[in-house]
A protein has these predicted regions:
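Bacterial N-terminal signal peptides that target proteins for export
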Residues: 1-13
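Aromatic (tryptophan-biased) beta-strands that constitute blades/sheets of beta-rich domains
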Residues: 28-75, 111-125
Length: 151
């Protein structure tokens, strides 16, 4: 192969690779239907939502609809909240408190639907991560979804 044909082949490969990357990025739609089922929004972890109701023009008109207070789950000044809430089927799921309780909250009203707290016993007292809660995931197993969390 001559140096000229080598350069042409390299340039062609670069164009094909860049073209593939660009088309892949454009093809990813992001989180669907206003839901946030995964840590990164969707299965591809794009952290993108295609929702367009909030714009620069109407941003200043936004009002607080509801607020989720978690102080009744054990206020601790050094608590480190690192959870990414999930939104599935009109319900927001999040970890709360120092024992990583999981709550389900109605996305429209802010009403608590349920709370689950696993009794970790002595293990929790010695755990280096006892003051943080993250690790929620959603699994769609063909009809009935599951909320999974790491304890």
């Amino acid at each position: 192969m001559t140096p000229r044909s080598c350069r042409f082949t390299r340039a062609l490969c670069v164009c094909l690779v860049l073209g593939g990357v660009t088309s892949t990025a454009v093809a990813q739609p992001g989180a669907r239907d206003g839901e946030w089922r995964h840590y990164g929004g969707d299965e591809a972890n794009t952290r993108y939502s295609p929702l367009d109701q909030i714009t620069a023009d109407n941003f200043s008109d936004l009002e607080l609809v509801w607020r989720m207070k978690t102080d009744n789950f054990g206020p601790v000044p050094e608590y480190n909240f690192q959870s990414t809430p999930l939104m599935v089927g009109g319900v927001v799921y999040s970890t709360v408190g120092t024992r990583r309780s999981v709550v389900a909250v109605d996305a429209g009203t802010g009403e608590y639907l349920w709370m689950h707290r696993l009794d970790e016993g002595e293990r929790a007292d010695e755990a280096p991560r006892r003051l943080s809660g993250r690790g929620l995931a959603y699994r769609d197993n063909g009809g009935s979804g599951q909320i999974i969390y790491v304890t």
